[in-house]
Amino acid sequence: EEAWERYGSHPAFAGWYLTQEVGRLQWNIIEVFHELGKFCKELSGGLPTAISPYIEGIQLYDPFRTGVNAGKSVTLPDFEREWNEIMAGITGCVDSISFQDGGCDYSELEDFLSVACYAGKKHGILINTNVEAFDRDMPIRFLPIKWDKMLLKLRAAEKAGVAGATMFEFSHFMSPNSSYFQAHGLNRCYQHYLAGGFEK
């Protein structure tokens, strides 16, 4: 309510991001997304709502365990079943879902996003990818991702049929003003890609 009272009249206030990030059907998340999304829509006259869950795959970083692989990767059939159930329960309250792409292996990303897109069409929810611009394959947490890995993820998302892409996190990992030297090169490669380079 406070955010709406302060900023709701600004033209830049175009919708809501529900910040609860989950990867699976857990913690009464259907009720949380349903109630929060419904509240935000009613408060703002129907402005769109979005969530950005992660794919709980082999690359998922668990700060409470040693190593990157948390040892609890979701299978594709379980992902499909759980997200169908979640989407069925939040239809009309959540308009778009941007799946964080860093949790699963590159070879599995297209399959997970394809399943998500199919479920999204079934339930009337727009599916996007949330491209993580940092590298999970390095012993240091976290450095800007190599361009060829980002391109691989963008192409997998395109093949899966996502509606669009968002990114986490531009200012640290891809900005030409970032303190990470690697971010400057990543930004140049991405600009070249947008201009039609690298044979989209």
Go through the PLM ranges and name each one.
Residues 1-200:
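Glycan-processing catalytic domains of CAZymes
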